[in-house]
A protein has these predicted regions:
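Generic alpha-helix initiation/capping and coil-helix boundary signal
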Residues: 88, 552, 568-572
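C-terminal low-complexity, Ser/Thr- and acidic/Pro-rich disordered "stalk" regions positioned immediately N-terminal
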Residues: 544-558
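Conserved small-residue
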Residues: 1-547
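Compositionally biased amphipathic helical and low-complexity segments enriched in hydrophobic
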Residues: 116, 550, 581-582
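Cleavable C-terminal sorting propeptides in eukaryotic secreted/cell-surface proteins
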Residues: 558-582
Length: 582
């Protein structure tokens, strides 16, 4: 969520002093992964990789120690993930843990639209002031106080909105691990919610695009556990249910966007004259003729759904690879994929059920049928559901090649159903979605072995955001955690069987300044959850090139026991300071 709030720093003054002129104290903790040590002599070591969803963003690496008898985690040392070789990070949001024990995340927002950045397009920026608060994204590069021409000479939005990966090799030293940080340009550029690579073969990675006109993407790496090269696909859906009724049911096919490597895409960002590539280097923009929903384009141009409407576009010769990676969403729509997903959020996988689950936070606007002027055109109007401000979670079965084949709603929120004044005993406008159901689902995680889907909210339609447990067999919905007013529950993730303990990761982001820690967020978990009768899996012995094997999967089948409570790993001051390089 985009806030950039100026929260109280009272709780931090003792640690960082009262002069905050060169420091931003973040309350934007988001996804936190727990990674297993590669050091056989130190199985109690666990690594936490922490997202901070700021402009600019930061990823910190915490060395944790796990208590063998209780499973409790404590911080021993703090490191950072250095993305300076990839121009730093902006607004790192949700994430996942790869099957090869690395951290995967992405950059979601915080940079201007590339159409506005291109001086050859209508409505292009003419002054640095046009960037608004996105100027904050340039502080770590020292460009935030320059004029527009100077910024354009040194920076482009195409540097951001990529998948990132953090790998930790502590096999030689726990105190000085090798932390490798990289962006994967091969996987395409979007408003990335998160990448998710399923832990089975053939290996497939899914990427969700949190936009008003988003796409769902699938990446197949050339080599397992190596995301530096592969083939990208975009989802095309055919609606099989009645238009404008319910959450919709769809058949799925996959449209190829071609093959690319990280190195190839990086090279394409810069033209032969040393300047950065622009939108009109890849696409020619044509004129629309006729109505808004059923307009026509000149010969050679295609009506293409883009953010804020639809355009007539023509791909320039030889620009397939550049467009497929730098303008993935628009190129996907151009070649016939579906680009009407509205706030396509978290995604997760059930190994036993062989299904993916993903959240659509707000099932409305571009997902509604024939919504003229808001991203629809008759040629690309693939999705037409009933408006639902409270959002839905969808289920998507996989075939033998681990590709999604169909989509149907699993659970949808209900707008203004239960919440009448006589039942709630209050008339809060912040409970406009049924309080006994989900509202604007954001992060999802599957508890393999327990057959439970975890659903975290990012909503203004519940007074307090919640984390829910959806029981797949009974369809029962249980609220397992709520956060204080003004806060979002972020980074919901099930860290499974680390030395016989499991953790439901859950951060508290941007709470009301009157709440705990003077408005600071927290990094923590529900648990520890004891996994009885299971082989402890705490050491990653294979490194980046080996998938975790069968012991951990078997351990997930054990029943949950023991006391579960919310534990703060570390006060936010340790995990939430960004020293601005200005």
């Amino acid at each position: 969520m985009d806030t950039d709030t100026k929260s109280s720093t009272t709780g931090y003054d003792a640690a960082i002093g009262t002069d905050h002129s060169n420091t931003k104290v973040s309350n934007m903790e988001d996804f936190v992964s727990l990674l297993k040590t590669r050091n056989i002599a130190s199985p109690e070591t666990v690594w936490a990789v922490v997202h901070l969803e700021d402009r600019p963003a930061n990823i910190q690496v915490l060395q944790l120690e796990q208590a063998a008898d209780t499973g409790l985690l404590s911080v021993k040392k703090i490191h950072k993930a250095d993305f300076s070789a990839d121009n730093g990070l902006i607004a790192t949001y949700a994430g996942s843990v790869s099957p090869w024990n690395t951290h995967l995340g992405g950059e979601e927002w915080g940079v201007p639209d590339s159409l506005k950045w291109d001086s050859n397009t209508a409505g292009a920026f003419t002054d640095a002031k046009n960037l608004g608060r996105d100027i904050l994204s340039l502080r770590h590069l020292g460009h935030h106080d320059k004029d527009l021409a100077a910024i354009k000479a040194a920076w482009t939005p195409y540097m951001h909105r990529w998948v990132n990966e953090v790998s930790i090799d502590d096999s030689s030293s726990i105190t000085t691990p090798t932390i490798t940080a990289t962006k994967h340009y091969s996987m395409g550029r979007y408003s990335i919610e998160l990448p998710y690579c399923i832990g089975d073969f053939p290996q497939v990675c899914y990427i969700t695009d949190d936009s008003n006109t988003g796409v769902a993407a699938m990446f197949i790496p050339d080599e397992a556990n190596d995301l530096s090269a592969g083939t990208l696909y975009a989802m095309k859906v055919t609606q099989t249910s009645t238009k404008s009724v319910g959450g919709g049911m769809f058949d799925v096919e996959w449209v190829s966007l071609g093959h690319a490597t990280n190195a190839e895409v990086q090279k394409l960002m810069t033209k032969s004259d040393g300047s950065y590539i622009q939108f009109t280097d890849m696409f020619e923009i044509g004129t629309k003729t006729g109505g808004d929903y059923d307009f026509t384009c000149a010969s050679g141009f295609k009506a293409t759904v883009v953010s804020g409407g639809a355009m007539c576009l023509k791909l320039k010769a030889g620009m397939e690879k550049a467009a497929s990676r730098l303008e993935t969403r628009i190129y996907a729509a151009y070649v016939g994929a579906s680009s009407q997903w509205r706030k396509l959020e978290g995604i997760t996988w059930s190994k036993n059920r062989k299904e993916m689950y993903f959240a659509v936070s707000s099932a409305e606007d571009s997902m509604e049928h024939q919504l003229a002027g808001d991203g629809d055109h008759s040629d690309g109007d693939h999705i037409g559901i009933e408006k639902n401000k409270c959002g839905c979670v969808y289920r998507a079965p996989l075939d033998a090649n681990n590709r999604i084949t169909s989509i149907s709603p699993l659970i949808c929120g209900v707008y203004e159903h239960f919440n009448s004044a006589d039942k709630l005993k209050h008339t809060s406008s912040k409970d406009t979605c049924d309080i006994h159901n989900i509202a604007n689902p954001d992060n999802v995680a599957f508890m393999n072995g327990h057959d439970i889907l975890l659903i975290g909210e990012d909503t203004s339609k519940h007074k307090n955001n919640a984390v829910w447990a959806y029981h797949m067999e009974t369809h029962a919905l249980t609220r397992i955690n709520t956060v204080v007013q003004g806060a979002e529950t972020t980074g919901v993730w099930y860290a499974e069987n680390i030395n016989g303990w499991s953790y439901i990761m859950n951060q508290v982001q941007h709470p009301d300044p009157a709440s705990t820690y003077g408005g600071a967020g927290t990094v923590g978990y529900l648990g520890p959850i004891k996994v009885p009768g299971a082989a402890a899996v705490g050491v990653d012995s294979g490194g980046k090139k080996a998938i975790e094997l069968i012991a951990e999967t078997k351990a997930a089948a054990a029943a949950v026991s023991g006391t579960v409570s919310f534990v703060t790993i570390v006060p936010a001051v340790f995990a939430a300071m960004i020293a601005l390089m200005i």
